[in-house]
A protein has these predicted regions:
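Basic/aromatic-rich interaction segments and small domains that mediate binding to polyanionic partners
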Residues: 2-64
Length: 65
């Protein structure tokens, strides 16, 4: 579904990580074991990294330019 360096959007809030739905991130690693998941780095409006954590495919959507 996604590959490394794809720009993605969080589909839901992750308050424990200070991420809100609609926040933009970049896939930095793809996992297949034990489940398909993606390590995503999220940034703020100025481009500063905010959080990095793994998400399941249904928690992300592609960012449309």
């Amino acid at each position: 579904m996604f590959k490394e360096n794809d720009v993605v959007v969080a589909r839901e809030d992750h308050p424990d990580k200070q991420i809100i739905a609609g926040q933009i991130g970049t896939v930095i690693c793809c996992f297949t074991v034990p489940n398909k998941a993606y390590e995503v780095e999220f940034i703020d409006e100025s481009g500063k990294p905010v959080a990095q954590f793994a998400l399941l495919p249904d928690e992300l959507e592609a960012y449309d330019l």
